[in-house]
């Protein structure tokens, strides 16, 4: 298994699919990385040379991925909560942030139902 950005990339999958195992790299970004490095997106990782894998590592390093991206997202959410703005309050209360209805639905964000006490 090749290791790129601290993630073990599966050998038996196509390059584009394998790159999506990295947090912060989706299909579009993976295709851009393959185009920049000149690596065939349909080639499997096990068929790539060490030089090509190094090129992929260098190209992935240009993007914010894995722990840095998670930290950045958490810091942005924390900033909203500290500001006390509407979005921050919704994050703090564990409710949907983007204007979805909550009278019904929103169970994923709100958690399991709580029984009504009498």
UniProtKB/Swiss-Prot annotation:
GO cellular component entries: cytosol; small ribosomal subunit
GO MF terms, alphabetically ordered: rRNA binding; structural constituent of ribosome; tRNA binding
A Pfam family recorded for this sequence: Ribosomal_S13
Keywords, sorted A to Z: Ribonucleoprotein, Ribosomal protein, RNA-binding, rRNA-binding, tRNA-binding
Keyword Zinc: no
Keyword match Ribosomal protein: yes
Residues annotated as signal peptide: none
A GO BP entry: translation
Chain intervals for the UniProt region annotation (Disordered): 93-118
Assembly: Part of the 30S ribosomal subunit. Forms a loose heterodimer with protein S19. Forms two bridges to the 50S subunit in the 70S ribosome.
Family: Belongs to the universal ribosomal protein uS13 family.
Job description of the protein: Located at the top of the head of the 30S subunit, it contacts several helices of the 16S rRNA. In the 70S ribosome it contacts the 23S rRNA (bridge B1a) and protein L5 of the 50S subunit (bridge B1b), connecting the 2 subunits; these bridges are implicated in subunit movement. Contacts the tRNAs in the A and P-sites.
Name of the molecule in the record: Small ribosomal subunit protein uS13
Organism: Pseudomonas fluorescens (strain Pf0-1)
């Amino acid at each position: 298994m090749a290791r790129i950005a601290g993630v073990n990339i599966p050998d038996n999958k196509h390059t584009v699919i394998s790159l999506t195992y990295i947090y912060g790299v989706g299909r579009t970004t993976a295709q851009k990385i393959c185009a920049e490095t000149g690596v065939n997106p349909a080639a499997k990782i096990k068929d790539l040379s060490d030089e090509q894998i190094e090129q992929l590592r260098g190209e992935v390093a240009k993007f914010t991925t894995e722990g840095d991206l998670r930290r950045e997202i958490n810091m942005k959410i924390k900033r909203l909560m500290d500001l006390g703005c509407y979005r921050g309050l919704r994050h703090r209360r564990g409710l949907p942030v983007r204007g979805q209805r909550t009278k019904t639905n929103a169970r994923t964000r709100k958690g399991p139902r709580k029984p009504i006490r009498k």
